[in-house]
């Protein structure tokens, strides 16, 4: 049975619910009021962002290997899109027939010849390889001077192409994923940490469909906390590596409609993870998921923060999505919770990763409005307003920021 009884709410919690699908223009006006924007702010932001972008581009241009390759094949180009589609898809396809079809679809249309210039060996080698691959899976051009060579290579067929592409894409994937396991990721982080970088680790995976799934994910999180805790070596939640937990992975019925089960079954599991994190003095973040799960995640956060056994632990973390129209009210609530608990809460501000599904779900459900901003620059504006709120509070939250946007 579903528990649809309304829970008593504080004024701040009520504001979160009331602004679930608030009119977008009203939200923007509120954000502008929070920001109190002026031309001096804009000038300074442009200067800092321009310097950051130029430094990153210079490093990419001077870089070797995959960095140079990604700089060459931009995501706005047909070739860049083809490479990213392969990187996203090829590793997930188990059968060779479908892999061949994917190669045919994504590679044969690219203008790889236009990228065979410059002095970067990796880019040129990749371009020539992709050029030949594109010809191999397309119709032969008898007028081409390279037709004979292509037909010769064609004798080997798509298995050679498939294996070569698989190797190349796996190599590219290693540039973006720290490791296939937490231990491999920790090993890969040793050198960057010596340069001053800090890491927060995510356990990639889907939501649990059964309790058996949840128990398996739970064991993975426990092992990960042990590994990260040992690597942390007493540096504390603020100065060492941390980890994020996806609540839908440790309980198959993580929803407001199942609140009683969430509190009686999921919370003890979550509490166990946080107590373990406290032993190692590492940060553990409750990761953000779909918008309809926000209230129940805040209920769990409040119960954790007010738990006597977790008193004084400054590694309790919560992720807030700036693309939600009620994000500023969530920040107000978390700050108030930290004050009530007399304990600092770690807050990580992100843009949000479920935009497509949030828009589609609202449309399918016939909602009058959306829970997220419909325009990217509105989300950017929300991010800045939320960041200002977070940085304006001393002693109650530890602010962390995640963004790919130099202006943010």
Q: Which stretches of residues belong to each language-model region?
A:
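Positively charged, amphipathic and often flexible ligand-engagement surfaces
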Residues: 1-408
